[in-house]
Amino acid sequence: MNIICVFIFLIISLLLIVNFKCTFMVVSACSMVLGCMNGVGPFGMYQAVSIAAFSIFMLRYFYWKDMRTYPLLFSSILLIVSYVLSNHYAVYRHYGSLVSCIVVDVASLFVFYQIISKNSRYIFIYIRTCVILSLVVGVYTLVETIISSNHYMFIVNSLELYSQDIIVEDIRFGMKRAQAIFGMHTTLGGFSTMMAGLLLWVSLNCPLYVKKLGKKKLSIAIGLMIIAVFLTGTRSTIAGLAVVLMSFFSFKHVKMKYVFIAIVSVVIGFMALDAYLDKIILSFTDMESVGGSNTDMRSIQFELAALFMMQSPFLGNGISYTFEYVADKYKEMCGAESLWIPIMIDFGMLGITAIIVFIIQVGYYIKKYCEIRLLFFLLGILVFNSLSSIPAFSFTQLFYLFVIIAFLKKHQESICDSPSSFPSIK
């Protein structure tokens, strides 16, 4: 057990006790960074903090009546049932992992929704933290790419702060693949795609937030996140971002001067980055032209997933079976390149059904409370996570972004003032 990680956990736990709601918003925004870190005992940092936060929430703030208004109640129950039954009938039972899965994938979403629904001013804490983190991650991504080295990862690995001591040194599209402060480049890609989408929506729809956060800082953060997606050198991330950005296109608001500027920018971009863009386009049409995963490897992984799923088709083989047994026995399964592969093996048809119901309920929530165009946002992340794994990211946490957007759309003027003074961007 790393003493530095224990100290970080104790500090965060103390902040949760002193100022639960603000701290929970900051922790939620930083979940993918905390998810890379070692924590306490068998739990990673984000898992341990989430369990501590949920315990405090249940003791202080939980009311049974709140369950009735929760929009994801059915899919949450289905996910919990899937986890419990799969673990109970598994060959190897993991009760610690069962608790962390339920808390991180299901309970944390409920806590987040209750905090926002009862005082939507806490949204500003989340957004401000996202802007700060995006600026830090974006700037460091550029530094890492320019110097072709990641000194931060060397330091944290020497201190054994992260659960995986992976330093990505692959070359893709002629440049080192960036991972910034995350354990993997795909985690950086997932974070950058979601932050680009969320902050772009805020910049286009929330003038009060833009003024309070600072237009330049917000624009720089968005630009850095989009650039970071390309610097990861991950095709699935680029494809996911392309779909996410479709959420913001509307013929109704297109003006000829912007069309002209866009055309000129694209032409200049192709002229300046001709070789780089050629490599990206070629990588989609000829996956063997670059290193990394390809269609054959993914096909083998899905064939193996189907094979092991048939051992227990309805309930699956139990939590962590994919990475503790299958990946250990079959090298082709290392870093299972899809959201669906571990679900198929670990949780079977019940788990697949639970995730599909979750996606449908989130889609309905977007249609009812956000904008129907934002279904492309959901689809973009689904495409990305279906093509690649995203370490330190739980797909269900995508719901955070749509809760934020829904309440911003409904209460923007009354929630621009933050109920707390941290963390400051000025």
Task: Identify the function of each model-found stretch.
Residues S203, K212-S219, A242-S250, M256-F260, ...:
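Hydrophobic transmembrane alpha-helices and their immediate junctions
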Residues A180, M184-T186, I226, L315, ...:
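A conserved mid-to-late transmembrane alpha helix and its immediate loop/hinge
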Residues I12, I127-V156, I166-G174, A180-T232, ...:
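Alpha-helical transmembrane segments of multi-pass inner-membrane proteins
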Residues V139-S149, T232, F249-S289, Q311:
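A membrane-periplasm/extracellular boundary helix in multi-pass inner-membrane enzymes
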Residues V18-G39, A48-F110, L379-N385, I425-K426:
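N-terminal hydrophobic segments of proteins, predominantly signal-anchor/transmembrane helices
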Residues L10-L14, A53-W64, Y83-I146, F358-Q361, ...:
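Transmembrane alpha-helical segments and their membrane-water interfaces
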Residues I56, M195-G197, A242, M246, ...:
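Transmembrane alpha-helices of multi-pass inner-membrane enzymes
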Residues C36-N38, Y276-F347:
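Long extracytoplasmic/lumenal interhelical loops at the membrane interface
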